[in-house]
From Swiss-Prot:
The keyword Signal applies. The record marks C296 as: May be important for catalysis. Glycans are attached at N241, N268, N382. The lineage of its organism: Eukaryota, Metazoa, Chordata, Craniata, Vertebrata. Residues 1-31 form the signal peptide. This is Tissue alpha-L-fucosidase. Its EC number is 3.2.1.51. Changing Q286R: In allele FUCA1*2. PROSITE patterns: ALPHA_L_FUCOSIDASE.
Length: 466
């Protein structure tokens, strides 16, 4: 404010010209249309990845469909049974189902009777998941929404008689959990796909009548935050018309500003084109990639869908899940952990237990995970039991094994006069010292087991280090 009695000086000509110039520049900037992406990979690959995905770090994957009815072997049951004719699958059918029983006969048994989307969403929220990806359609072709081009082979016409995709999306969004839709481009036994295959994929009957109408319908109907494409491997992206779809998705779709996609858009695309990279199932890079990536893995080591023949030894241990999460985030990736519900819509207790263990760990250590960035060093020298992340000026050292002597040795951080060291979940600063040859020594809190803030991994927070 001016002092009382002061008179304002008129703006000089130079100042007026400057203000006019700045105003005109701002008007031009605002008038410019948003960038449009052309249907080619150089243009599409140049689109910046929406920030929410890198910040999310942890998501839950759900494989659910008619394959959840036989619930044996894996979600590839139909292909192993009738596509490959594996003897063990044929024997399973002979022993458990009458002669002439077809895969389509499983459809009415996919009831989702106990599917309560609010309960699922509560579980995923308690697990600390920031996004959830649901199979809308696996390679069997059955759609978990009333697809207008999947007559009598969708969850509204057969089985549950419900819109499973829509119901789960509503529940997740009440909790501000991002919603991803998995969609298989191919269908093993669809007549039009088999016709295109017979024609060497020089025709696109299946793509025009089935794949593309479904993708556009999913986007317009459910407005997903993420599209997790799969089933691309038999054909190039030119057969799938992938670049045309993605240019529409980025330019004109209702989710153009926020949507994220993966890299499975043609046999030539994985780890090369798309939004973020999956590269392959359960991908684990050996060093920091230069592109955003995601590790997708399953609690059941041998299947993505639920299977009745799962043994306890087939279930990934809680400590291994936490370790994979930590390593993935340290290397700049997201961790997408899969569960397979039953045909009734139940998530079996051991899967719930594993998810809740992740949530409990993240409730203490999430500061080092969510919205973090890789540090200049991703793991401690000469060991794979200490991993680093960073956020702003803070560095986080996550260690997977509690040292027997209660002292953690870190060689990578360089201390300064302002260094401060704490442990997430514990009040107060930790004592530390340095050695010119061996680096930093941190005295861990001496606590009874019941007072240790987390299981499986612990986080040291360092500020004022280089």
């Amino acid at each position: 404010m001016r002092a009382p009695g002061m008179r304002s000086r008129p703006a000089g000509p130079a100042l007026l010209l400057l203000l006019l110039f700045l105003g005109a520049a701002e008007s031009v900037r605002r008038a410019q249309p948003p960038r449009r992406y052309t249907p080619d990979w150089p243009s599409l690959d140049s689109r910046p990845l929406p920030a929410w995905f890198d910040e999310a770090k942890f998501g839950v994957f759900i494989h659910w469909g008619v394959f959840s009815v036989p619930a044996w072997g894996s979600e590839w049951f139909w292909w192993h049974w009738q596509g490959e004719g594996r003897p063990q699958y044929q024997r399973f059918m002979r022993d458990n189902y009458p002669p002439g029983f077809s895969y389509a006969d499983f459809g009415p048994q996919f009831t989702a009777r106990f599917f309560h989307p609010e309960e699922w969403a509560d579980l995923f929220q308690a697990a600390g998941a920031k996004y959830v990806v649901l199979t809308t359609k696996h390679h069997e072709g059955f759609t978990n929404w009333p697809s207008p081009v999947s007559w009598n082979w969708n969850s509204k016409d057969v089985g549950p008689h419900r819109d499973l995709v829509g119901e789960l999306g509503t529940a997740l969004r009440k909790r501000n959990i991002r919603y991803g839709l998995y969609h298989s481009l191919l269908e093993w036994f669809h007549p039009l796909y088999l016709l295109d295959k017979k024609n060497g994929f020089k025709t696109q009957h299946f793509v025009s009548a089935k794949t593309m109408p479904e993708l556009y319908d999913l986007v317009n109907s459910y407005k997903p935050d993420l599209i997790w494409s799969d089933g691309e491997w038999e054909c190039p992206d030119t057969y799938w018309n992938s670049t045309n779809f993605l240019s529409w998705l980025y330019n004109d779709s209702p989710v153009k500003d926020e949507v994220v996609v993966n890299d499975r858009w043609g046999q030539n695309c994985s780890c090369h084109h798309g939004g973020y990279y999956n590269c392959e199932d359960k991908f684990k890079p050996q060093s920091l990639p230069d592109h955003k990536w995601e590790m997708c893995t399953s609690i059941d080591k041998f299947s993505w869908g639920y299977r009745r023949d799962m043994a306890l030894s087939d279930v990934t241990e809680e400590s291994e899940i936490i370790s994979e999460l930590v390593q993935t985030v340290s290397l700049g990736g997201n961790y997408l952990l899969n569960i397979g519900p039953t045909k009734d819509g139940l998530i079996v207790p051991i899967f719930q237990e594993r998810l809740l263990a992740v949530g409990k760990w993240l409730s203490i250590n999430g500061e080092a995970i969510y919205a973090s960035k890789p540090w200049r060093v991703q793991w401690e020298k000469n060991t794979t039991s200490v991993w680093y992340t960073s956020k702003g000026s803070a560095v986080y050292a996550i260690f997977l094994h509690w040292p027997e002597n209660g002292v953690l040795n870190l060689e990578s951080p360089i201390t300064t006069s302002t260094t401060k060291i704490t442990m997430l979940g514990i009040q107060g600063d930790l004592k530390w010292s340095t050695d010119p040859d061996k680096g930093l020594f941190i005295s861990l809190p001496q606590l009874p087991p019941s007072a240790v803030p987390a299981e499986f991994a612990w986080t040291i927070k360092l500020t004022g280090v280089k």
